[in-house]
Regions:
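Mature N-terminal segment immediately following signal peptide/propeptide cleavage
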Residues: 2-24
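Extended ligand-binding groove/face enriched in aromatic
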Residues: 19-218
Length: 219
């Protein structure tokens, strides 16, 4: 019945927030004893994943639960996600696939043994130091901040939202499309090939996700 469903939801959320989350952030999957964890690739204990179904996806889930129940327990869980995403937000306003609470040096160290050996995942093979539109990580995070801000108009969520909006507008090319990564990386080509991440990108619904976010902002 409804009471059992609500109790199960709260138990699951409490487990995720208290036992699984890393300062409000998440990866994709974990061993039962939490000794290893993965996003699209294996992560270190200090890392979180932005790329769905990672941290922003959990934020949307908590907001959905809050809307369904009116229980602030879920809103507070969403706020913890927001804290992690504010840490992970690039100064330009977008997000990378991943973030590391241990700092940039630790993140760069991850790229050496793990990222650079990412077969078929070329974008993980180099630390670009910028943000990506690939796989909707930036779009999911931006939409989450929009929803969170609109919910209670808490001013602390207006700044990351405004930065995300500016990022999407600043990175759009005059013909209307977006690159895969922004700001433009310098000398970032792989395997002797020119860098492709500044090219107009339609893969993984880059343009569609950005347009959807902007339409949500307008509405």
């Amino acid at each position: 019945d409804r009471a059992q469903v609500l109790a199960a939801m709260k138990r699951a959320t409490t487990f995720m927030v208290e036992k699984v989350a890393n300062k409000g952030g998440y990866v994709w999957s974990y061993l039962p004893d939490m000794t290893r964890r993965w996003g699209e690739m294996e992560a270190t204990p200090t890392m979180i994943w932005i790329q769905p179904p990672g941290t922003p996806s959990m934020g949307h889930l908590f907001l959905d639960a809050y809307h369904a129940t009116g229980d602030d327990h879920y809103y507070r869980a969403a706020e913890q996600v927001a804290s992690a995403l504010m840490f992970a937000q690039h100064p330009s306003g977008g997000w990378n696939y991943i973030a590391d609470f241990a700092g940039e040096a630790s993140l760069k160290k991850w790229y050496d043994p793990i990222g650079k050996n990412a077969w078929r995942l070329e974008e993980f093979q180099h630390y670009y130091g910028n943000a990506t539109f690939d796989d909707a990580g930036t779009a999911e995070s931006a939409k989450f901040f929009l929803r969170l801000y609109v919910e209670k108009k808490d001013p602390k969520y207006k700044a990351p939202l405004d930065k995300a909006i500016k990022f999407v507008l600043d990175s759009q090319y005059p013909i209307g499309v977006w690159p895969q990564r922004f700001p433009k990386a310098q000398a970032a080509g792989l395997h002797g090939l020119p860098d492709y991440t500044s090219y107009a990108t339609f893969n993984d619904d880059v343009a569609a996700e950005n347009m959807d976010f902007l339409l949500m902002c307008y509405q």
